[in-house]
Curated annotation (Swiss-Prot):
Function: Plays a central role in 2-thiolation of mcm(5)S(2)U at tRNA wobble positions of cytosolic tRNA(Lys), tRNA(Glu) and tRNA(Gln). Acts by mediating the C-terminal thiocarboxylation of sulfur carrier URM1. Its N-terminus first activates URM1 as acyl-adenylate (-COAMP), then the persulfide sulfur on the catalytic cysteine is transferred to URM1 to form thiocarboxylation (-COSH) of its C-terminus. The reaction probably involves hydrogen sulfide that is generated from the persulfide intermediate and that acts as a nucleophile towards URM1. Subsequently, a transient disulfide bond is formed.
Cofactor binding summary note: Binds 1 zinc ion per subunit.
InterPro entries: MOCS3/Uba4 (IPR028885), Rhodanese-like_dom (IPR001763), Rhodanese-like_dom_sf (IPR036873), ThiF/MoeB/HesA (IPR045886), ThiF_NAD_FAD-bd (IPR000594), Ubiquitin-activating_enz (IPR035985)
Location(s), subcellular: Cytoplasm, Cytosol
Annotated organism of origin: Kluyveromyces lactis (strain ATCC 8585 / CBS 2359 / DSM 70799 / NBRC 1267 / NRRL Y-1140 / WM37)
Gene Ontology molecular function: adenylyltransferase activity; ATP binding; metal ion binding; thiosulfate-cyanide sulfurtransferase activity; URM1 activating enzyme activity
Protein name: Adenylyltransferase and sulfurtransferase UBA4
Key words, A-Z: ATP-binding, Cytoplasm, Metal-binding, Multifunctional enzyme, Nucleotide-binding, Nucleotidyltransferase, Transferase, tRNA processing, Ubl conjugation pathway, Zinc
Taxonomic lineage of the native organism: Eukaryota, Fungi, Dikarya, Ascomycota, Saccharomycotina
Binding site residues for ATP: G81, D102, S109, N110, L111, H112, R113, K126, D170, T171
Amino acid sequence: MTETERSNESLLEEIENLRVENAKLKNDLCLERSLNNASDLPMSLDEFKRYGRQMIVDETEGLMGQLKLKNASVLVIGAGGLGCPSLPYLAGAGIGKIGIVDNDTVDTSNLHRQVLHDTIKVGMLKSESAKQVLNKLNPHVSVTSYPVRLSNENAFDIFKDYDVILDCTDTPMARYLISDVAVNLGKPVVSASALRTEGQLSIFNFDNVGPCYRCFYPTPPAPTSVSSCQEGGVLGPCVGLVGVAMVVEALKLLLGVYTRENFKPFLLQYSGFPDQTLRKFKMRGRRVDCPACGTGRTVTRESIESGKINYQSFCGSRNYSVLTEDERIDVHKFERDYWNSSKTKPYVLLDVRPSLHYSISHLPNSHNITVNELRDLPADLNNLQSKIPHLSADSEVLVLCRYGNDSQLATRLLKDKFNLKDVKDVKGGFFKYIDEINPSLPKY
């Protein structure tokens, strides 16, 4: 280390010591004023008792720190897997104003991980369900729900009244929008994602000098590589841990723990299996050429609100519409045809869901082969026949998946790659069949 570097390090250490000392003096002065005039306390006696064990932690700066939280506001976008663990800890910590953006409703399939909601709230708006819980948890916190889908048209109006944004969404499209709006308004974003047994989180646009989401990810991922909890699954405690970690970072921002001198861009990664691991990676700072936060930025409020920036087009989407109407049948025709005992040559029913899905619930006499397996097989009918007994070139084949998306891709592959002539996709898939034909089958 050079003499200059040692000198700079010494100065930074001295600045940090002075900051801590200044905070302590402010805290002592605030407390002294409060005690001299008990009728003019900065918080109610209930709040002192409620937050007491938090205030005596050195890192929270005592009463001064608690007043920072009381006067702070946090917007949580998404009251799902990440939002549910985040919200009660924000309210419990005494954040003065909390906003919740979510237009989705509670579903039974959410409850294993979205533990802020419960069985009797199935069908209720998630934002309203969460608001009810927070109001009961801490009456000293003001909670506003926004039961709307966040868009380029409403994001600026919603964001403007909040100090910190928590991005608890689950799509790249939403993350780009949130980051872009936050940069334009000068708001920091705590952003996280979680899937299966893993998760990650970062802070974007710290103090208007930190990198934004576009700096980390200039190009969106291919739509085919993006998986949702609905498709890929998620373990509740794993996403819960990441959501709670988001609150820790939000508190650091609000308490002033991070400064321009000590903040370093990072990516925190959590993995729950096979061993629990938590790793922190140092990331690069702002990109000079970033269109959102760089020197010649083009992602402006006007370009966002006017729709010039098309987030859906930028991020892309999977194209499942690869069949004609003649190549598809509805579940009612499927029910009539598949179980037709008078048919001399039975249909071959292919279920192209992942094998783990298939093991949970499936129709009798079906054969399980995934879309990826079909893609990987050499283009020869003999290879396909080795996987599916009784299949021949003139077989009548019906294809089923979970929702009727992958089955369309599989039908196209069977016809184009393996030259099968009579292949039909079942619209809406296995779940549509359960909903409209046989609700006694397990729906997961």
